[in-house]
């Protein structure tokens, strides 16, 4: 029989839902055209081979970028849902946001586990007065995270974006990893070849200070896992309130994925863009339903007071917010400080 603590951990893991889904280049929406699609939106273990990209399906395309471009990667809780009504990664899954890149021969077929990854963007604890995390900044901006492409030699690369959720990271194995990858071709006259690289898995250990971390104890700093970023300064922790105003124009956020892909390329010989005919869907005629009496439903009184949404916090030591959940969710304890609607 599983222990109560292990059941709480499994409940917290099951509640975590988010994947990286879209890419933008200088404000142009590239959608999922060069995304390595994830099999599902569950977190990845620190030692799993899926930690590299969490990829189930590779893309036949690469998106073209160059040094100095502003690249935005986009995360959402459910696949295909680009609305800002729901947090990109909810349930107070606070922690760092990082972006890595790796030079490869052909981004369309490259083995992400064999790649040499260098970091190009990071943010951990944005402020300690009050504590404000990179994930909160991500959520403020409807799941959009923007970085500048550093000086890089031309060629194919993989982009790896990542969230580490620390809400149950106070014990070994509690940190939850949400990576995702995009396939790109860097053009231009750059010459940079980063040398401080890591492998995934292998870049992090379960006992690293930024992986094994109790976010419910008073903390004034946070050590971001992984190497120092290339082409930009390491992130710092502010001791003044972090601005919560979105820098991304959420009012212009599209609700669908674009049907026209951005320019593609594959090294020296760009691959042809092929048009795939829509699948032919066949179905059997519906079987008439059998007649039966409807079940007798006994109405229940709706819960009173303010209700928390799915994955939102609903209890825990020091919590003063809603303690009841919107139907059909129930308030479930992850630990003594954090309960959420599952």
Curated annotation (Swiss-Prot):
Positions glycosylated per UniProt: 189
Compartment(s): Secreted
Cofactor details (free text): Binds 1 copper ion per subunit.
Sites where the protein binds O2: 167, 176
Organism superkingdom: Eukaryota
Entry binding sites for Cu(2+): 17, 93, 178
CDD domains named in the record: LPMO_AA9
Annotated S-S bridges: 63-181
Keywords, comma-separated and alphabetical: Carbohydrate metabolism, Cellulose degradation, Copper, Disulfide bond, Glycoprotein, Metal-binding, Monooxygenase, Oxidoreductase, Phosphoprotein, Polysaccharide degradation, Secreted, Signal
Chain intervals for the UniProt region annotation (Disordered): 281-302
PROSITE patterns, per database record: CBM1_1, CBM1_2
EC number in record: 1.14.99.56
Enzyme class: oxidoreductase
Record-level Gene Ontology MF annotations: cellulose binding; metal ion binding; monooxygenase activity
Keyword Secreted applies: yes
InterPro entries reported for this sequence: AA9, AA9_LPMO, CBD_sf, Cellulose-bd_dom_fun
Biological function: Lytic polysaccharide monooxygenase (LPMO) that depolymerizes crystalline and amorphous polysaccharides via the oxidation of scissile alpha- or beta-(1-4)-glycosidic bonds, yielding C1 oxidation products. Catalysis by LPMOs requires the reduction of the active-site copper from Cu(II) to Cu(I) by a reducing agent and H(2)O(2) or O(2) as a cosubstrate.
Family, as annotated: Belongs to the polysaccharide monooxygenase AA9 family.
Name of this protein: AA9 family lytic polysaccharide monooxygenase AA9-X282
Gene encoding the protein: AA9-X282
């Amino acid at each position: 029989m599983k222990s109560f603590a292990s059941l709480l951990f499994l409940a917290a893991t099951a509640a975590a839902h988010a994947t990286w889904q879209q890419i933008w280049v200088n404000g142009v929406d590239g959608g999922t055209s060069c995304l390595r699609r994830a099999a599902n939106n569950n977190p990845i273990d620190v030692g799993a081979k899926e930690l590299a990209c969490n990829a189930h399906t590779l893309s036949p395309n690469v998106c073209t970028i160059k040094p100095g471009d502003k690249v935005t990667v986009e995360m959402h809780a459910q696949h295909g849902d680009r609305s800002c009504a729901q947090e990109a990664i909810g349930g107070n899954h606070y922690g760092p946001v990082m972006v890595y890149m790796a030079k490869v021969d052909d981004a369309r077929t490259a083995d992400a586990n064999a790649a040499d990854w260098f970091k190009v963007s990071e943010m951990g604890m944005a402020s300690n007065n009050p504590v404000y995390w990179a994930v909160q900044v991500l959520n403020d901006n409807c799941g959009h995270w923007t970085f500048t492409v550093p000086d890089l030699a031309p060629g194919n690369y993989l982009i790896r974006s990542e969230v580490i959720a620390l809400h149950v990271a106070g014990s070994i194995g509690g940190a939850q990893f949400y990576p995702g990858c995009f396939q790109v071709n860097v053009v231009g006259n750059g010459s940079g070849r980063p040398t401080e690289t890591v492998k995934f898995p292998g870049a992090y250990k379960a006992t690293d200070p930024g992986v094994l971390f109790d976010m419910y104890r008073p903390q004034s700093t946070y050590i971001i896992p992984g190497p120092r970023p290339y082409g930009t300064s390491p992130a710092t922790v502010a001791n003044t309130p972090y601005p919560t105003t979105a820098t991304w124009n959420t009012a212009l956020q599209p609700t669908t994925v674009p049907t026209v892909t951005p320019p593609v390329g594959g090294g020296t010989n760009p691959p042809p863009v092929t048009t795939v005919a829509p699948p032919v869907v066949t179905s059997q005629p519906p079987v008439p339903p059998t007649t039966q009496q409807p079940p007798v439903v006994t109405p229940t009184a709706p819960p009173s007071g303010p209700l928390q949404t799915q994955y939102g916090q609903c209890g825990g030591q020091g919590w003063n917010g809603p303690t009841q959940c919107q139907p059909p969710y129930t308030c479930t304890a992850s630990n003594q400080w954090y309960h959420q609607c599952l």
